[in-house]
């Protein structure tokens, strides 16, 4: 989630700086003060809204994901954002137990292409990456349009272009479908149930996963983004989808985790 940042003040010149540097600093300071006024008026409310409920940090190593570190640092949720492969977590079974004891796990896109041969992880996620074809337009159907992870999008979500995953090993009686497809766009001749996003309760914990998130124009709301195919409206819908799922996983938004295996 991109949070607007407050303007930074100019660096003060040295005490013995020449008058030209002092004049430049004073001009920059005046411009900064105007920028702060504009920030407080136009941007600060949005920034406060986005940071009021939770803080986020990026882990550059795996040690912070040990169960003990998660407890010691009072971490409420872990996000696998486009991770892939056999991540050497310090204690994978302990990590799954941390979720069961009240933690939250959130996976995005290639998060299901992670630890595919590790039973504690695949059992926790309840769905495994099984390949994808070329990027295509896709029509998504809501499994639960009242759930926060629906993003207030409604019954149908039309994507102009995305890399749509195939998912295997999902026990539908253990998850609540949030978004799914009735036809996979890479295999339009096949009718069925193709998971896109789901949630589940796991012991005292919660899991939210979405297969979406490959294209940059889903993440970015920059209308001038090079190569944009999805409109900015879709980018905002994607953000609402993610933020709704994160808030639900953290217990900040109500929503059911009751499995809905007959949804089609």
Enumerate the predicted regions with their spans.
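Solvent-exposed loop/turn segments at secondary-structure junctions
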Residues: 83-87, 105, 111-115, 155-157, ...
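Sec/Tat-exported extracytoplasmic proteins
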Residues: 79-82, 103, 153, 249-253
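Helical hinge/lid and interdomain linker segments adjacent to catalytic or ligand-binding clefts
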Residues: 1-107, 111-114
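Glycine-rich, charge-decorated loop segments at or immediately adjacent to ligand/cofactor-binding or catalytic sites
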Residues: 113-125
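Catalytic beta-strand/loop cores that center a nucleophilic Ser/Cys/Thr
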Residues: 33, 37-50, 54-63, 127-211
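Residues at alpha-helix caps and immediate loop-helix transition turns in enzyme cores, especially N-
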Residues: 90-91, 117, 192-194
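Extracellular ligand-binding/catalytic regions of CAZymes and related secreted enzymes
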Residues: 8-38, 42-54, 185-194, 201-264
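Non-transmembrane alpha-helical segments in soluble domains
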Residues: 96, 122, 150, 243-247
